[in-house]
Amino acid sequence: LGETILLAPLVRPRAWGWSKLSYRLLSPFVDSIPRRFSENSSDPQFLDFLREHDPLQPRTLPTAWVGALTRWVPRIERAPRRALSPLVVQGESDETVDWRHGLKVLREKFDEPRILLLEEARHHLANESEGLRRRYFDFLS
């Protein structure tokens, strides 16, 4: 109780340089782009639900969202160091966030974060296979 827990934390998205360049080139001309769903969980039923049945999943990515990220990323990277030791769970197969960069930043921002790396886990840790969930629940408890 009272712990700070970060699951696949977003410091910056994967391929951030490309995304920023695309945003600068396209945002004056388009309001959104079609969304591409990625394989961000090893649970095929969850992935099917996201793609086909979840009414909260947008089919387009607003360029304003990428614009918000252009403000978020520098803000997080400039944030002052905190006297916290969060628990961090990160999948090494996560292709949504730039997790290597994120862990480097988190190590700079926090006092000795406790990090669990799961080699085969992807971004949607809460919707990963039961075995992966068990491993990080054991780490968190």
Task: Please place each PLM-identified region on the residue numbering.
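Catalytic active-site module of serine/aspartate enzymes centered on a nucleophile-bearing elbow/loop
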Residues: 112-141
